[in-house]
Amino acid sequence: MIIKHLHLINYRNYKKIDIELSSGLNIFIGNNAQGKSNILESIFVLAFTKSYINVKDQYLINTDGKFALLRADCVSSTVENKLEIIVSEKSKKLKINGDEIKKYSDYISNIKVLIFSPYNVNFVKVGPNTRKSLNMVISQFSDSYVKMLQNYNAVLKKRNQFLKSIDCFKEYNRFYFDALNERFCALAIEVVLERNKFITEINKVLCNIYEEITGYKNLYLKYSCNIEFSEIKDTMLEKFKLKTKSFFDREKACGMTLLGPHRDDFLFLLDGKELSIFGSQGQIRAAILAL
């Protein structure tokens, strides 16, 4: 699906702008600080409901406005959709063809977006930025992943709340925690299997694409996970349950969940060496572009 028309009101430095886009290559030319990057950012926001820059939604609103409106007329060979997002200081509304969408998972993946910017350099650094970026990419290709990730995060939040509430000197509802942990483990397995599937497919082509860009081979995306993989899903689940039980006292002491896909790492390896540590800025940018 491509965007044929973009309409912005009170977005960043634009009070109002309408842009007709072609189905081929579109190039924006202008002086510095004229808003070229803001146009690209608005398209990303329409795809993911949030900016690729780590900023609060309220900063997307023009300083003279009380809200920002973003609208895109999108078309594919089979369907036409009008995507719309209204951002205010305290809320955000999502619409498709005029109908308000309540669930993020029902909105995302309508348009596929890939952005290459200076902010992408953080992608190769281990931690939340990498997980967040990969979650966004996978979400564009798997509606089920969006829902399972939302469910996982909801259960993770409840699990953390329970761990924080435990008084070491009083009895607590272990039956409730066991039921919560059962659900947590099942969702964790679903998330890591989907991530591993995506990484496996990426690695089939990543090395060749990187070689075409740089002339160098042996780029690999490594998935570092604290859940032991097995060909049998039930075996993975049972092993992870046992592992969470062995970590319970430590988690109770620190009041947070120490295992699960929210702790996963993704590492770019070039010739077996971690790119974020040993790679040049050029190699890092080329790796992101290849991905």
Protein language model features and the residues they cover:
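Conserved lysine of the Walker
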Residues: 36
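Conserved NTPase motor "head" modules and their coupling/switch loops across ABC/AAA+ ATPases, GTPases
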Residues: 1-31, 171-291
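Nucleotide-state sensing region of NTPase/ATPase domains
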Residues: 48-130, 135, 142-145, 203-208, ...
